[in-house]
From Swiss-Prot:
This is Armadillo repeat-containing X-linked protein 5. Residues 1-14, 139-156 have a biased composition (Basic and acidic residues). Belongs to the eutherian X-chromosome-specific Armcx family. InterPro entries: ARM-like, ARM-rpt_dom, ARM-type_fold. ARM repeats lie at residues 300-339, 422-461, 463-503, 520-558. Residues 1-34, 139-163 are annotated as: Disordered. The lineage of its organism: Eukaryota, Metazoa, Chordata, Craniata, Vertebrata.
Amino acid sequence: MVDSGTEARARGKAEAGLQDGISGPAAARVNGKTQAKAVAEAELKTESVTQAKAGDGAMTRTHTVTYREAMAVTREVIKVEDTTKTRVMVQTKTKPLAERSIVPQTKSRAMPISRVSTVTKSEVKVVAVIEANIKSYAKSHDKANTGSRPDRREEASIGMKSSDEDEENICSWFWTGEEPSVGSWFWPEEETSLQVYKPLPKIQEKPKPTHKPTLTIKQTVIAWSRARYIVLVPVEGGEQSFPPEGNWTLVETLIETPLGIRPLTKIPPYHGPYYQTLAEIKKQIRQREKYGPNPKACHCKSRGFSLEPKEFDKLVALLKLTKDPFIHEIATMIMGISPAYPFTQDIIHDVGITVMIENLVSNPNVKEHPRALSMVDDSSESSEGPKSGESYIHQVCKGILSCPMNSPVQLAGLKLLGHLSVKFEDHYVITSYIPDFLTLLNKGSVKTKFYVLKVFSCLSKNHANTRELISAKVLSSLVAPFNKNESKANILNIIEIFENINFQVKTKAKLFTKEKFTKSELISIFQEAKQFGQKLQDLAEHSDPEVRDKVIRLILKL
């Protein structure tokens, strides 16, 4: 009760002093400090009594309340001093130096309290500072301002010391010891030398293979110009005969690879003969039958024909009945020993392997076999090169016409003639046989028509042959197979022939003159052209897109 009365009286005095006004700066400071001391004494006494009764748990709560009240009152006193100071500055511009020193001392009292309020970690030290302040305020309650200055200085020094220690404690929360350098955040404290980047050693690349000079066609032909000798002989050797029994072997000095055609079997050019028994060939055929045509596990040579073991036995039995080299040549092609050319593969596949050999063995017309064999050899660009003379072309054409219709030999001759007709200088010989070829075109099979149309296609590219190709007979023979029932390959060949003829006619308009064409010929040509135009319109709706596209382009060109 006494404490509360004292506090009330102090507050009353402060209010009265503020209302009445302060006559001088010294009186205002003394009254303000006296009021602050009185309030602080009353509050701090209350705090000390509460600490004695409550204990550690209550100390923290009373500290918090006491600090807030003291700070609030101190701030009010500071405001009063500031207003008083401004009034004094207006009234008088000069004031003693002794009076100036009082204001910072009052501020110094507030500084420890404010710092103590911010630091919550050092409660023990704060209690000591507060007890010292209470004692100093109690002793100097009735004393003059000069007597309280040393205590205030001691209090300020204590507050500054405690604040420095508290700052050190706060710093210890974040780091300890000496302050590390920035570089230690990224690497150890020990200074390490900068590492120079060294590129990885390059892997030694294999030296690039030297470019081999490509041989010309002439040099390649000379390189392969070696003689070839293939025959089936018994293992025991002796005379070159074909006994009915015995283990036969293939003997060959070299396998010649024709220019431009890759052989089905690659046999290196050994110095000695190459031996392969029929039993080994039969074993390879059985492996191929077991593993498939191109297996990875099969070690047999690649073949162009699928020959079953039964067919192989039958083929061997047929070979024992004849000594014809042409039949043995075909047998080596079927076995995959000798290279089979594309057109011979087609012929053998179409006719049948054993059927062909059987027909050749039983065929009484033995004279055409060597001729067909010579055609096969000549078409493969041997060491002497293709025979391109006039007499040779006559011989080939006569051989084609003398063979039976649609026979394999005739097909081989037609394909050979297609290769020979590439050169324009030999066309005048071939054009003399056009009427005979038209007969093959009208009566032949699909393959016979195909090879005849190939020959006509080569002839249509030459301007000198246009006169013969646009005759009534040729046009009617070309238009006849031009329908939807014909094979796609033949239709495309006929379109190509008419495209070439159309180009020659448009570039050379002098073809239609009285000296070269009669009136009847021109009428027949126009009639055939009209019929051809109607068939073109029908083929424009062909099911095959390639044929349909070619027909539409030809219509636009015409």
